Amino acid sequence: MADQPKPISPLKNLLAGGFGGVCLVFVGHPLDTVKVRLQTQPPSLPGQPPMYSGTFDCFRKTLFREGITGLYRGMAAPIIGVTPMFAVCFFGFGLGKKLQQKHPEDVLSYPQLFAAGMLSGVFTTGIMTPGERIKCLLQIQASSGESKYTGTLDCAKKLYQEFGIRGIYKGTVLTLMRDVPASGMYFMTYEWLKNIFTPEGKRVSELSAPRILVAGGIAGIFNWAVAIPPDVLKSRFQTAPPGKYPNGFRDVLRELIRDEGVTSLYKGFNAVMIRAFPANAACFLGFEVAMKFLNWATPNL
């Protein structure tokens, strides 16, 4: 296996991880909106077509009815959360690696990298859950014709007033179920591909931008291949009226399989996979570029 990344300062981690996260959200949010609307659309009545027939139909209708701003609905919530979330994400991955090293020069196996990635998923849940909750509510209200919330802060304020802190953190368990294994797959795949793509005699840190894009994009696809079923459950649970699912994700899972079959757990699959490659390619390239710039501009930071 090729060389491990060198330790970086928390401030550099914050700045580079935040920049990578902003790149991810900006590139991927339109298809994330499509994904959430597909996952949360109500079952069609007998003899009537569904609200959206698929990814491209949802994209087309959203663009036609709401314009380009409709595709970026609810983006403020993930943008606000990405800087600390991605800083914590990369910090958690680095900490997970360090905890498994007996000596600083030890090279970790791929199962160890997977475990380190899982730790990053635990770290990010506290930031991710409220952002996802608000984002999903804002994304579906436009398609449903309701306008309960005027924006991100208004949504957070009303959730807290109505349900307290638990209302904002609704879906925490499902976020953990999604992000812990998916983050393990995410980082392990990225490190594996970086090692594969590194030419003979070169270091991983010298990998070209196109190869970073490909490694990051494929890592995103592997991440979402693991994350889609719990993500469907999370989206449905977080946007449901209070009290609809008293037993949590078990009730959501039971209802989905009963009413729509096992394939309902992969609602929005096309939108997710179309989004996964460019969004995560942008994330990792943004992170790597920011880190190189910071190491050049402020080597002692």
Curated annotation (Swiss-Prot):
It is found in: Mitochondrion inner membrane. The chain crosses the membrane at residues 13-31, 74-93, 113-131, 171-190, 212-230, 268-287. Signal peptide: none annotated. The modification N6-succinyllysine is found at K170. It is a multi-pass membrane protein. SUPFAM superfamilies: Mitochondrial carrier. The keyword Membrane applies. Residues 2-12, 94-112, 191-211, 288-301 are cytoplasmic. PANTHER family: MITOCHONDRIAL BASIC AMINO ACIDS TRANSPORTER-RELATED, MITOCHONDRIAL CARNITINE_ACYLCARNITINE CARRIER PROTEIN. This is Mitochondrial carnitine/acylcarnitine carrier protein. It comes from Homo sapiens.
